[in-house]
Regions:
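Ser/Thr-rich, low-complexity intrinsically disordered terminal regions
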Residues: 1-100
């Protein structure tokens, strides 16, 4: 099972900003939204392709003016290095949605 975790801090962005950007970012990267947990600032998505089901989630945490967002991407049938393209696609869309 492969897994990638990327954590970044976004100065001037709140956890709410990150949470609000996450659904569009995941969808634009080809993921279907599976679950949203507004109180936890967490959005979970998945997609299926020839490699099986790939899971991705974006979560955020305070402080309010410098939120930290965490992207996790995993798949039972792929190694971590093969998941990098999916993580890169989500991060690119996420940062576009945040306007950074």
């Amino acid at each position: 099972m492969g897994k990638i975790r990327i954590e970044k801090t976004y100065n001037g962005r709140s956890p709410d900003d990150c949470y609000n950007a996450a659904p569009a970012a995941l969808e634009k990267a080809g993921f279907e939204i599976f679950k949203k947990r507004e109180i936890a600032w967490l959005v979970i998505g998945h997609r299926s392709d020839e490699n099986g089901q790939i899971q991705a989630s974006i979560g955020a945490r305070p402080p309010a003016i410098s939120a930290t967002a965490t992207l996790s991407v995993s798949c039972d049938n792929l190694e971590s290095e093969n998941l990098q393209e999916y993580a890169d696609a989500v991060m690119e869309q996420f940062e576009k949605e945040l306007g950074v």
